Regions:
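A short, Lys/Arg-enriched interface patch at domain edges and termini
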Residues: 49-79
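Short, solvent-exposed alpha-helical "recognition" segments
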Residues: 27-34
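Exposed aromatic-hydrophobic patches
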Residues: 44
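Short Lys/Arg-enriched helix C-cap and helix-to-coil transition segments
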Residues: 34-41
């Protein structure tokens, strides 16, 4: 499992601006970043690839919001299985 920084996340989506990712987060269409330092955030690579695959598959915004909720829930279970 890797942690991707914002430039890598933008590249995965083809976005040019930071705001496009943060707007997607506010809309519930992307997971929130995880703290990797006092001021640094990153995104688990499997979350980014899962969300990109959902977009490619033509999933609706409602489906993607449900997927985002499931990915956030999965984060809490990761520690229990480690």
């Amino acid at each position: 499992m890797l942690i991707l920084r914002l430039p890598e996340v933008k590249r995965a989506y083809g976005h040019k601006s930071d705001a496009s990712i943060y707007n997607a987060i506010r809309a519930g269409l992307h997971t929130t970043g995880v703290a990797i330092g006092q001021r640094a955030r990153g995104w688990p690579d499997y979350e980014v690839s899962t969300l990109v695959a959902a977009r490619i598959a033509g999933k609706s915004d409602a489906d993607i919001r449900a997927l985002v909720n499931a990915l956030h829930a999965k984060r809490t279970g990761l520690l229990a299985t480690a």
